């Protein structure tokens, strides 16, 4: 026997044709807002001029360095190249003492945060006539945007031995025949005795001038 009771009506109202479009628009706005938030986070993650300089000096001379930690040698170079060391208020000894004080007992490097602490220590000595905050800002200005200075490029040193082996004008024998007066190699002509079939004896300097002499005499 079939159930004659009336079925309850569906209370969920049907969606209008325009509602799917509204849902898509809301979803798009949500995604755009998330993208903007990620962009702001990325912008905030950009390196400051001070940290960028720190990383450049941290990787100097070490291809395997990550740039997140700095050795004492590079710390000293940074202080020299950026003129934190002035030879009066701040010396190389001061720089070494501060580095040993800031780094951990069992560590050989300092992080960027420790680097800033070390600069605060040196700022007190470098700019004694300024307040602590002003002194730190002045030290930061000395370093921001800087990079390691490459110096001590090896120069060629001339010696009698090197000159004898490389100066073609001093070559003798068969070696001399391989180069022209300018020092340029003659190629195959300088290595192989080529047969001269011109009819002139070797060493004759007026080859090919007979016709000119005859015509000039007429």
Curated annotation (Swiss-Prot):
Q: Where is the composition biased (Basic and acidic residues)?
A: 20-31, 174-183
Keywords from UniProt, A to Z, are: Cell cycle, Cell division, Cytoplasm, Cytoskeleton, Glycoprotein, Golgi apparatus, Hydrolase, Magnesium, Metal-binding, Mitosis, Nucleus, Phosphoprotein, Zinc
Q: Where is this region: Disordered?
A: 1-37, 165-192
User: Would you list which residues are glycosylated?
Assistant: 151
- Which biological process, per GO, is one annotated for this protein? oligodendrocyte development
Family of the protein in this entry: Belongs to the TPPP family.
Biological role: Regulator of microtubule dynamics that plays a key role in myelination by promoting elongation of the myelin sheath. Acts as a microtubule nucleation factor in oligodendrocytes: specifically localizes to the postsynaptic Golgi apparatus region, also named Golgi outpost, and promotes microtubule nucleation, an important step for elongation of the myelin sheath. Required for both uniform polarized growth of distal microtubules as well as directing the branching of proximal processes. Shows magnesium-dependent GTPase activity; the role of the GTPase activity is unclear.
Its recorded name reads: Tubulin polymerization-promoting protein
Q: Which organism is it from?
A: Bos taurus (Bovine)
Source species taxonomy? Eukaryota, Metazoa, Chordata, Craniata, Vertebrata
């Amino acid at each position: 026997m079939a159930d004659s009771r009336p079925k309850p009506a569906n209370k969920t109202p049907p969606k209008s044709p325009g509602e799917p479009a509204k849902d898509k628009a809301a979803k798009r706005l949500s995604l755009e807002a998330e993208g903007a938030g990620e962009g702001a986070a990325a912008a905030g993650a950009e390196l400051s001029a001070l940290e960028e300089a720190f990383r450049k000096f941290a990787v100097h001379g070490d291809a395997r360095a990550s740039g997140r930690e700095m050795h004492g040698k590079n710390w000293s170079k940074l202080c020299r190249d950026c003129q934190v060391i002035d030879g009066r208020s701040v010396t190389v000894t001061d720089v070494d003492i501060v580095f040993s004080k800031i780094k951990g007992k069992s560590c050989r490097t300092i992080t960027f945060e420790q680097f800033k602490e070390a600069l605060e220590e040196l700022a007190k000595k470098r700019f004694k006539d300024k307040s602590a905050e002003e002194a730190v800002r002045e030290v930061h200005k000395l370093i921001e945007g800087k990079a390691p200075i490459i110096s001590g490029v090896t120069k060629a040193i001339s010696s009698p031995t090197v000159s004898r082996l490389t100066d073609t004008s001093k070559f003798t024998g068969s070696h001399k025949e391989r180069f022209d007066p300018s020092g340029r190699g003659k190629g195959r002509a300088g290595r192989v005795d080529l047969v001269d079939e011109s009819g002139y004896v070797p060493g004759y300097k007026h080859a090919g001038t007979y016709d000119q002499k005859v015509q000039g005499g007429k």
